[in-house]
Amino acid sequence: MEDISSKDIDELKKYLGSLGEKPFRAKQIYKWLHQSLATDFSQMTDLSKALREKLSNEAYITVPEPVDIQISREDGTRKYLFRLPDDSLVESVLMKYKFGWSVCISSQVGCRMGCAFCASGMDGLLRGLTPGEMLGQIEAIQRDVFSDTTDCAKKHEKHTTDCAKKYEEYTTDCAQKNTAPSVPKPDSEEYLRNRISHVVVMGTGEPLDNYDNLLIFIRMLTDENGLHISQRNLTVSTCGIVPRIKELAEKKLEITLALSLHAPTQEKRRKLMPVANKYDISEAVGAMKYYQDTTGRRVTFEYSLIKGVNDTDEDAEQLSSLLWRGAHINLIPVNPVKERTFAAPTRAAAIDFQRKLEKFGINATIRREMGQDIDGACGQLRRRHLER
């Protein structure tokens, strides 16, 4: 069976040609999949019945199945656990900002990076996600936003699966009735008001460890015939695979690249992040400077603040010496993980660390903590379900 959800328009043309179909069908099908968010070939009403049946027999649409949806009572952040066709589980997060909806997605099932403070890599890497599975997370959440099924969160406890069941019933009902999900017309006021406009590839997995599929995903995500999300509204986070950072720089894309730094020195970073055993901290930072100079896009450094580990005055001074003046660092109070002993510093201590960096000429922000009353840390929701 062909994974039709992972094919860009050019690949769709080739595939349809092998079925004896005209090239113009590719754009029609692509729009159904990634703009109208169809979940079944039978919903593609401007295709002949014969072609719909042929596609049903030859190909499949990646539709992640919601296993659990948690919704924060504090800020409305929604955390999704999806089951993929091979029964793998992945997490995604939907966040509401003043500018609109933003989604954080996973790029792999598990992770091989093994960062000491992260729940995602505790079970190692199972596999990379296909472009369709990465897009599928966004599209499943977009269907949810458009269908407004998550009102049930107001009536149930945070760990309920009722939201997921209601969403599953909605998509199943659409398939049974051969109707597409209730997606507003593109450019309509309702569509523009509720569309996901920003994407962060910062969930489970190392995106640059799934490099080829990541590039296809970016191409499809930004296609005007699909979700049409601007490259400038896409952030990709990496632990620091230096050759891939440089290779990505040569593509001269307009995406934002973020480096998970988390330590001010090679010695400390090696203890927290095994990737530092392969790529020295100065190499990783140098690659980010190369990316910024080559693309003209400002890069970001992520720094999980861990009480007593990397939050001292000396750490702030060493960090400012490592980075260039005017660099931007995003301070993230570490999320508690039950299998780890790491804890976040107090809010006051985090602000003090931020001010010290700014005194040294580093632009520092403290990430807004969202979804703290649900399984907010990356990988936690998946692990909780696997342990059942």
What spans do the regions from the language model cover?
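Auxiliary Fe-S-binding modules of radical SAM enzymes
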Residues: M1-V90, K96-K98, F146-K154, D173, ...
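Generic detector of bulky aromatic hydrophobic side chains
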Residues: E53-S56, I105, Y279
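Conserved Radical SAM active-site core
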Residues: S88-S92, K98-S106, M113-E254, T265-E267
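Conserved AdoMet/S-adenosylmethionine-binding subsite of the radical SAM
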Residues: R143-D148, Y191-F360, A364
